[in-house]
Amino acid sequence: KGIVFGKKGNKSYYSPTNGEGHVACFAGSGLGKTSSILIPTLQHWDGTSFVIDISGDICDNVEIQNKIIFDPDNADSILYNIFYSIDKKESDEAKDEALEQLAYLLMPLENNASDTSVFFTVEGRKILTASLITYYHMGMDFVEICERIVSKDHVTLFEEIDAINNYKALQYVTSFAGTSERNTAGCKQACDTAIRLFATNPHIKKSVGRPQKGREAFVPEQLEEKNVYVKIQDAKLEL
């Protein structure tokens, strides 16, 4: 058992499970990469797997146990719980630190970014971090927080953060006091751009969140014991 390459005559060619773990396969469209190599390998693989499945061609043809299918275009699909690891942390300080790390993931610095772009990203990330901390500790879920942020201008958002009076959150936005309204609006726009998909796309909104009644949620820890398939439609690859 291992990575299956195919058959020639009576001989089967494969890389055993305990052999080299990295294999790349390059070929034109429709030449059998999925059907002759990937699907047979997944069918006989003893370990777990994480599969990005374009249009469901792989998932529909692999019958294995412990399979989780995450399909953002399917309203009945399992959810992805982005807050799972944060919810598990015991102290508010640890949760706040994790929320700041999440803001970094959502608003990373681009390579070769201009000084102006860096400014708006870094300062916009402060707004996002303050908002995540404020609304997370109010019990909101991720999509709900994104909707709350995007629906408000920077003045209204800052007023709400100030009124809720979470000390840690306030530390991220006090530096905006007395600064240019135009620059602050630009920072808020950068924040909105980073999370707009989660606040406005109906498919994404229905696929991200904590477990709900009748709907389980997938969490990263399950990669250690489950076979996870992420289904993405061809048309979404350029988004």
Regions found by a protein language model. Give the residues of each.
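N-terminal pre-Walker A segment at the start of P-loop NTPase domains
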Residues: K1-P16
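P-loop NTPase motor domains
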Residues: G19-L239
